[in-house]
Design a protein with these regions (language model features):
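Active-site glycine- and acidic-residue-rich loops that bind
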Residues: 5-7, 97
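Left-handed beta-helix
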Residues: 83-87, 91-288
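Gly/Ser/Thr-rich beta-alpha loop segments that engage phosphate groups in nucleotides
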Residues: 5, 78, 142
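Conserved core of the sugar-phosphate nucleotidyltransferase
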Residues: 8-83
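Active-site acidic Asp-centered loop
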Residues: 1-3
């Protein structure tokens, strides 16, 4: 499994498909726009979903037959017959010409040996509404990580975290509920279209943002379209827009981030699409 992908899948259905196809390796796949496919392993399949070609991050991705604008991308979810995998890993370890990579070595070899099958994600995805494409996000970049988090602030997000039939299990420490304090003009703790996690205390304004656990937003501050990781503290009179703040950072009083592209690029890391990443090391490097 890939550790930087977000999706809901019933693995039992993919496992059953693997057994039914009778191949040594099964790779989950999903249709993506051809332009986006350059960042993934891309495959070609026959009518029985046997993989006939596999290329890792191609400059010119092959298209899905009949769909010239789309490609079949690997989701980084593999099922192997155990003995086959152990034998292949030992063989690969002894190969001085191998890069020792699943996408570049193990999977392409399985394809050449006619031992690789594809599993369409639509057969095992969970929680997809009729007419809706299966939800799958690769969050391996700052932009995609920000996008996936901010998506959750929608009134009816594509990924439903409130689905009791298929909950997303994760470790959550025992923390007090989130708290919103003060009710004075210009000093009113509130959050609109936002996700606020346990242990957080809000006395400023939060709009369309995701706050992880134990975040503190002090009075007179405004947080918009931002993702704040655990134990972040936002001082007074701070303004944040389209920012990702790493765990444990303290933003000093009066700091403005996300409103001046040139200043942000000098102090922090700013992506081409305008998302600013702030880490403790970046803050420590700022002049006194």
């Amino acid at each position: 499994l890939a550790g930087d992908h977000i999706y809901k899948m019933n693995y039992a259905l993919m496992l059953a498909d693997h057994v039914a196809k009778g191949r040594a390796c099964t790779v989950a796949c999903i249709e993506v726009p051809r332009e986006e496919a350059k960042g993934f392993g891309v495959m070609a399949v026959d009518a029985d979903w046997n993989i006939t070609d596999f290329v890792e991050k191609p400059a010119d991705p092959p298209s899905v037959p009949g769909k010239p604008g789309h490609s079949l991308a690997s989701m980084g979810i593999y099922i192997f017959n155990a003995k086959y995998l152990f034998d292949e890993l030992e063989r690969d370890m002894a190969d001085p010409n191998s890069s020792h990579d699943f996408g570049k070595d193990i999977i392409p070899r399985a394809v050449r040996m006619a031992q690789a099958a594809a599993h369409p994600f639509e057969l095992s995805c969970v929680g997809t509404q009729p007419g809706q494409a299966p939800y799958w996000r690769d969050v391996g970049t700052i932009d995609s990580y920000w996008d996936a988090n901010i998506d959750l602030t929608a009134t009816d997000p594509l990924l439903n975290l409130y689905d009791r039939n298929w909950p997303v299990w994760t470790y959550q420490p025992q923390l007090a509920p989130a708290k919103f304090v003060h009710n004075e003009p210009e000093r009113r703790g509130n959050a609109i279209e936002s996700l606020i996690s346990g242990g957080s205390i809000i006395s400023g304004q939060v709009l369309r943002s995701v706050l992880f656990s134990s975040v503190r937003v002090h009075s007179y501050s405004l947080v918009e379209w931002s993702v704040l990781l655990p134990e972040v503290e936002i001082g007074r009179h701070v303004r944040l827009n389209r920012v990702v703040i790493d765990r444990g950072c303290r933003i000093p009083d009066g700091m403005v981030i996300g409103h001046d592209a040139e200043a942000d690029a000098k102090r922090f890391f700013r992506t081409d699409s305008g998302i600013t990443l702030v880490t403790a090391a970046m803050l420590a490097a700022l002049p006194e």
